[in-house]
UniProtKB/Swiss-Prot annotation:
It comes from Acholeplasma laidlawii (strain PG-8A). One of its GO terms (cellular component) is cytosolic large ribosomal subunit. SUPFAM superfamilies: Ribosomal proteins L15p and L18e (SSF52080). Part of the 50S ribosomal subunit. This is Large ribosomal subunit protein uL15. Residues 21-31, 42-52 have a biased composition (Gly residues).
Length: 146
């Protein structure tokens, strides 16, 4: 097999439509746009969501909720996920990024207590749930709020 000799399978590629090239082409004269009207004109057509003057659907539906611009979002890590580390490891947000337990550190890392922690670790994070603190200390580890 030579890469320069490869050809597409017959029927896999379509030839380009040549518009406005005489009646024999099948797309001559009006070029598939029909006769007159808004959609036949240059730049013609209606904007997305336009319903002919009737109140559009997106305006008929009531507005809901709001975006809280002061919201602080933390990357979440559960205690069961910390079992991948060896005993005595100092777990930091940087280490969690390296081991891909978090994809990105948003406003920081928060540790939650889902699952059982079986390793003795020193965990450094921005926030801890009360049950996560208890779980880490019950396993013999220590916590440190950054």
């Amino acid at each position: 097999m030579i890469l320069s000799n490869l050809k597409p399978v017959p029927g896999a590629r379509h030839s380009k439509k040549r518009l406005g090239r005489g009646p024999g082409s099948g797309t001559g004269k009006t070029s598939g746009k029909g006769h007159k009207g808004q959609k036949a004109r240059s730049g013609g057509g209606v904007r997305p969501g336009f319903e002919g003057g009737q109140i559009p659907f997106f305006q008929r539906i009531p507005k809901r909720g709001f975006n809280n611009h002061t919201r602080v979002e933390y990357a979440i890590v559960n205690t069961k996920e910390l079992n991948v580390f060896e005993d005595g490891t100092v777990v930091t947000p940087e280490l969690l990024l390296q081991t891909k337990l978090v994809s990105k550190v948003l406003a920081g890392v928060k540790i939650l207590a889902d699952g059982k922690l079986e390793k003795k670790l020193t965990v450094k994070a921005n926030k801890f749930s009360n049950s996560a603190k208890e779980a880490i200390e019950a396993a013999g580890g220590t916590i440190e709020v950054i």
